């Protein structure tokens, strides 16, 4: 999550957050992502762990950034009717992460908000030259699993399927779609689907397993660590 203002601002009903997707290209990206996550929990936690743009400026190397779902900064600006702010935000992220490392994320789950945001995102991408990436917000594996997801949400939130105010997804499109389904859904921008393979090809970080790396902590007063623990 990215803080509305800074990660240190924590005022009720003012300091919310926006979604953002960060992917590791290499070891540098992984280390920077780890630093961002740590700071989000230690310094920026306010309902959710949050980074801010200052941290992104400091730890963006080796990362690929996607503009995220409807809860992202740019879609939210579009939904509020401020296209110019959305465009300015997109250009800020593009300039920060660099050419080829920032993508306008396109999603279409048949929601009313998608009908508003999607055309504007495509327009923005074409005006700025920022590449697009088509994704799907997948919360379950198959389309027919939508009902099971609804039941699980009721269990999580203490509601029943009969409750009118229960949390629910408005469509059954939040599943893992096939390649053909995605190309059909985004037939007007096939490059947005093709770009997902380009992104995957850039993510080349391999975890090193079997080599435990425990942080070193120096005991106070020059004491030996074991002696300090025994004390």
Feature map (PLM): residue ranges:
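Phosphodiester-processing cores and adjacent nucleic acid-binding clamps
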Residues: 1-231
């Amino acid at each position: 999550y990215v803080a509305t203002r800074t990660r240190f601002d924590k005022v009720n009903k003012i300091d919310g957050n926006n979604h953002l997707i960060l992917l590791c290209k290499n070891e540098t990206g992984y280390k920077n992502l780890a630093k961002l996550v740590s700071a989000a929990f230690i310094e920026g936690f306010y309902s959710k762990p949050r980074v801010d743009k200052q941290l992104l400026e400091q730890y963006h190397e080796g990362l690929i950034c996607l503009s995220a779902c409807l809860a992202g900064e740019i879609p939210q600006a579009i939904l509020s009717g401020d296209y110019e702010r959305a465009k300015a935000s997109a250009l800020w992220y593009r300039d920060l992460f660099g050419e080829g490392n920032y993508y306008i994320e396109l999603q279409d789950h048949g929601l009313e908000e998608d009908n508003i945001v999607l055309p504007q995102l495509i327009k923005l991408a074409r005006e700025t030259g920022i590449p697009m990436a088509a994704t799907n917000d997948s919360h379950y594996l198959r389309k027919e699993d939508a009902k099971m997801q609804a039941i699980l949400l009721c269990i999580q939130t203490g509601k029943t399927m009969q409750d009118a105010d229960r949390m629910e997804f408005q469509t059954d499109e939040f599943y893992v779609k096939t390649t053909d389904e995605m190309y059909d859904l985004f037939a007007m921008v096939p490059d947005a689907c093709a770009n997902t393979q380009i992104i995957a090809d850039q993510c080349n970080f391999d975890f090193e397993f079997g080599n435990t790396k425990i942080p070193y902590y120096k005991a106070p007063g020059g004491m030996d660590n074991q002696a300090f623990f025994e004390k």
